[in-house]
Amino acid sequence: MTLRSILHYPDNRLRQLCPNQTEYNDDLRKLISDMFETMYHEKGIGLSAIQINVITRVITIDVSKDKNEKIVLINPLILEKREPIVFDEGCLSVPGFYEKVDRYNYIKYQANDIEGKVFEAESTDLLAVCIQHEIDLSLIHI
């Protein structure tokens, strides 16, 4: 595992549209391992690959208090969203800044797992908000 540097706003590299991840191999596993190490080191709950200057749609998340519930979403896509809320969000790429953002408390989404298999899942509350935030980063919504 390698600790990676996080890009900070207004770095223009954060404004790149990320293409879908197409290769599922040891390089991807290493990237994901590095992303978790970096995210935990920075005390974050989510990280998009673009934040460490890797231009692909890979997201790592762990909203658990004990940091033992790792979630990896590759090429995530929101299929359904309900229950609008306003959430006070922070971002590792904009340290110390928080802003109220319109989100949804419930989402149904599709993603690939680390082997490339497509799956669907539902999330609510903080996890749903975190997924929406990280997807936005990979789609140039910073």
Enumerate the predicted regions with their spans.
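Positively charged
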Residues: 1-140
